[in-house]
């Protein structure tokens, strides 16, 4: 994601796909990154590591907020962003990241106008349906969680439950 407003949606998405698909040595490992925050940590792997992934870019066309960086007297090397809105800076980071990453592996793009109730509901429905279809294609039951039950059983035993 390139907008922090979507980060908790990604936490839900990780649980949905990890818990539904991750069975019987099948499924994809879901992870999320919030660009530009994660460009140096996970971005390094994406750019130069093993190309074992595909990436979904999830973004909002209208973040619903605006903040313009005002010039100051500090010579910090960032004067090139003076007068620019954060949304413009985030869009440049998004475009540059998509351009670089799409040279190495497939990138899916999901852009939404805004994050309102209708869009949020549509996004949830889309991912739930996609997860269900994926599980059916790979032949796993999306509704059980045997792997989770293993650690819970051990934890409860260790705690005397």
Task: List the predicted regions and their residue ranges.
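A SIS-like phosphosugar-recognition module
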Residues: 1-161
């Amino acid at each position: 994601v390139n907008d922090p407003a979507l980060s908790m949606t990604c936490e839900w998405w990780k649980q949905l796909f990890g818990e539904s698909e991750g069975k019987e040595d099948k499924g994809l490992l879901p992870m999320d990154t919030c660009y530009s925050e994660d460009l140096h940590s996970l971005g390094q792997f994406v750019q130069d590591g093993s190309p074992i992934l595909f990436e979904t870019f999830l973004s909002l066309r209208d973040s619903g907020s605006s903040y313009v960086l005002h010039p100051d007297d500090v010579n910090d090397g960032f004067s090139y962003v003076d007068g620019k809105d954060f949304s413009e800076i985030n869009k440049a980071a998004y475009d540059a990241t998509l351009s670089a990453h799409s040279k190495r592996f497939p990138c899916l793009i999901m852009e939404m106008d805004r994050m309102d109730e209708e869009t949020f509901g549509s996004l949830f429905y889309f991912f739930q349906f996609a997860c269900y279809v994926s599980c059916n294609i790979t032949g796993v039951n999306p509704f059980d969680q045997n792997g989770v039950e293993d650690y819970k059983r051990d934890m409860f035993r260790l705690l005397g439950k």
